[in-house]
From Swiss-Prot:
<keyword id="KW-0813">Transport</keyword>
<keyword id="KW-0520">NAD</keyword>
<feature type="transmembrane region" description="Helical">
    <location>
        <begin position="29"/>
        <end position="49"/>
    </location>
</feature>
<comment type="similarity">
    <text>Belongs to the complex I subunit 4L family.</text>
</comment>
<keyword id="KW-1278">Translocase</keyword>
<keyword id="KW-1133">Transmembrane helix</keyword>
<comment type="function">
    <text>Core subunit of the mitochondrial membrane respiratory chain NADH dehydrogenase (Complex I) that is believed to belong to the minimal assembly required for catalysis. Complex I functions in the transfer of electrons from NADH to the respiratory chain. The immediate electron acceptor for the enzyme is believed to be ubiquinone.</text>
</comment>
<dbReference type="InterPro" id="IPR039428">
    <property type="entry name" value="NUOK/Mnh_C1-like"/>
</dbReference>
<keyword id="KW-0679">Respiratory chain</keyword>
<keyword id="KW-0830">Ubiquinone</keyword>
<keyword id="KW-0472">Membrane</keyword>
<protein>
    <recommendedName>
        <fullName>NADH-ubiquinone oxidoreductase chain 4L</fullName>
        <ecNumber>7.1.1.2</ecNumber>
    </recommendedName>
</protein>
<dbReference type="InterPro" id="IPR001133">
    <property type="entry name" value="NADH_UbQ_OxRdtase_chain4L/K"/>
</dbReference>
<feature type="transmembrane region" description="Helical">
    <location>
        <begin position="4"/>
        <end position="24"/>
    </location>
</feature>
<dbReference type="GO" id="GO:0008137">
    <property type="term" value="F:NADH dehydrogenase (ubiquinone) activity"/>
</dbReference>
<dbReference type="GO" id="GO:0042773">
    <property type="term" value="P:ATP synthesis coupled electron transport"/>
</dbReference>
<keyword id="KW-0812">Transmembrane</keyword>
Length: 99
């Protein structure tokens, strides 16, 4: 029982560290995507232990992982298209107002 709460706290601390890195490191798109994936991994760990603790089925974790993979693929496709058009992945060279 205490081990389960330790895992809950560990996943929450991982999520908070991921949020801190996401907010503080805004220079490159790749580092931002990596911090987002770290946050998703910590949420998956929290979800896994929560579902095990409550004796629920693991079907929702499959859907969660599927959407996380889709999010990662979309982020990488944006990164590749940004590098092709601008030559780098700096946020300073990318403007949303440009077409």
């Amino acid at each position: 029982m205490a081990n389960m709460f330790l895992m809950f706290y560990l996943s929450m601390i991982m999520f908070l560290f991921g949020c801190m890195v996401f907010v503080s490191n805004r220079k490159h798109l790749l580092s931002t995507l990596l911090s987002l994936e770290y946050m998703v991994l910590s949420l998956f760990i929290f979800l896994f232990f929560y579902l095990n603790f409550m004796n629920y089925e693991m079907y929702f974790s499959m859907f969660f992982l599927t959407f996380c993979v889709c999010e990662g693929v979309l982020g990488l496709s944006i990164l590749v298209s940004m590098i092709r058009t601008h030559g780098n992945d700096y946020f300073q060279s990318f403007s949303i107002l440009q077409c």
